[in-house]
């Protein structure tokens, strides 16, 4: 079942503490807690895709559903990626500016400067080591 996505209006409210805390590294991918968070992130992402019709580049991180685990789920053009313990291992020095919207900050879309290219190391939901490179303005 999809969890409610934590959101707030920065003009009226303080940021919920879970959104500013450092996440905890996942040590047991097969644990019930980890699997539940992965399921709920996927379910919540499905709900957002249905509601907004966005299919590419939309994603959620565990703190957005009130979990402090280091997990993110991202919808790419042809597949969905579950990233456990993701870490940026390389980023370009050149940058780009893109319009970004955040589901946790109500009504916030803005131009954000970010590296043009990044490389992320992560574990997939089966524990396999993976890397993913974002070559264009779609940097996460």
Which functions belong to the PLM regions below?
Residues 1-140:
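Positively charged
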């Amino acid at each position: 079942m999809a969890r409610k996505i934590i959101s707030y209006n920065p003009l009226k409210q303080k940021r919920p503490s879970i959104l500013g805390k450092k996440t905890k590294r996942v040590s047991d991918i097969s644990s019930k807690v980890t699997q539940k968070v992965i399921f709920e992130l996927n379910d919540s992402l499905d709900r957002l895709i249905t509601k907004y019709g966005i299919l590419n580049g939309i994603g959620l991180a565990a703190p957005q559903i009130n979990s402090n685990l280091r997990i993110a789920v991202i919808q790419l053009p042809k597949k969905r990626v579950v990233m456990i313990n993701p870490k940026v291992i390389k980023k370009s020095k050149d940058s780009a500016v893109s319009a970004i919207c955040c589901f946790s900050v109500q009504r916030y879309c803005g131009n954000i400067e970010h590296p043009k290219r990044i490389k992320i190391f992560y574990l997939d939901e089966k524990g396999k080591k993976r890397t993913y490179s974002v070559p264009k303005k779609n940097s996460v």
